Structure formats: structure tokens, C-alpha cells
Curated annotation (Swiss-Prot):
It comes from Sulfolobus acidocaldarius (strain ATCC 33909 / DSM 639 / JCM 8929 / NBRC 15157 / NCIMB 11770). The keyword Ribonucleoprotein applies. NCBIfam families: PRK08562.1. CDD domains: Ribosomal_L32_L32e. This is Large ribosomal subunit protein eL32. The keyword Ribosomal protein applies. The gene is rpl32e.
């Protein structure tokens, strides 16, 4: 199993939200949260001019070692039942539990009690 991320490891910092060109001018474009590559001949973002929003590049990607980890440095696991909890009880040092949003209150309380018994950490109590 992998070890939790070390404290001296480079943290991802604040993620840049890459917005589409002219997203603030048109409601139709502003609603779309998806990046599209600018293709215009004089487009300032495509030309990477100073003062304009950054263009998507591979250099913004997080390190492989910490990609997908919880901010605590633990690997998040989605849990929907007590059976799932027991499956991850063995490698509990490097795992943090996330209870599924579709779980009701009664089952959620049951999962929290079981996780505390097994000594597992829960991200969304």
C-alpha cells in the first residue's frame, strides 16, 4: 500500500480555473464551465499575451504522487455500505472514508459508528 503524502511534498496550491475566452461577455458562454481552445488569429489568450487569463498547459498538472489525494495526504475511498468499510479496514493507515451522498441518515449513522470502531477517518461526517 502507498504511504500518506509527506509534509515536505509539494502541495498543489490553489487550482487555476481555466475559463473560456469572452466568458464574461455572453451569458451562454459564461454558463459553460468547459475550456475550449482559442483558435482565432488575433486571440490574446492563444497568443499568451500579458494581462490575459492563462492557457491550459501540461505544466499546471499536479505531481503524480499527490494527484487524487485528500488534502490530508490520504487516499479517499467512497463507501456505500458496511461491507465496503470492512474491506478497507486492513489498510486503514493510508485511507480516508467518504460516505456516499445517496446514503440516508439512518445508514450514515450506522456507517460512522462502524468506522469509529475500526479506527477509520471520515472526511464528510
Amino acid at each position: 500500500m502507498t504511504k500518506p503524502a509527506k509534509k515536505n511534498m509539494k502541495s498543489p496550491g490553489k487550482a487555476i480555473k481555466f475559463l473560456r475566452f469572452d466568458w464574461d461577455k455572453y451569458y451562454r458562454i459564461g454558463r459553460q464551465e468547459r475550456w475550449r481552445k482559442p483558435r482565432g488569429i488575433d486571440n490574446a489568450i492563444r497568443l499568451e499575451l500579458k494581462g490575459y487569463q492563462p492557457k491550459v498547459k501540461i505544466g499546471y498538472r499536479t505531481d503524480k504522487q499527490i494527484r487524487g489525494l485528500h488534502p490530508s495526504g490520504l487516499r479517499p475511498i467512497l463507501v456505500k455500505s458496511v461491507k465496503d468499510l470492512e474491506a478497507f479496514a486492513k489498510g486503514k493507515q493510508d485511507v480516508i472514508i467518504i460516505i456516499s451522498s445517496t446514503i440516508g441518515l439512518r445508514k450514515r449513522i450506522e456507517l460512522i459508528k462502524k468506522a469509529e470502531e475500526l479506527g477509520l477517518k471520515i472526511a464528510n461526517r
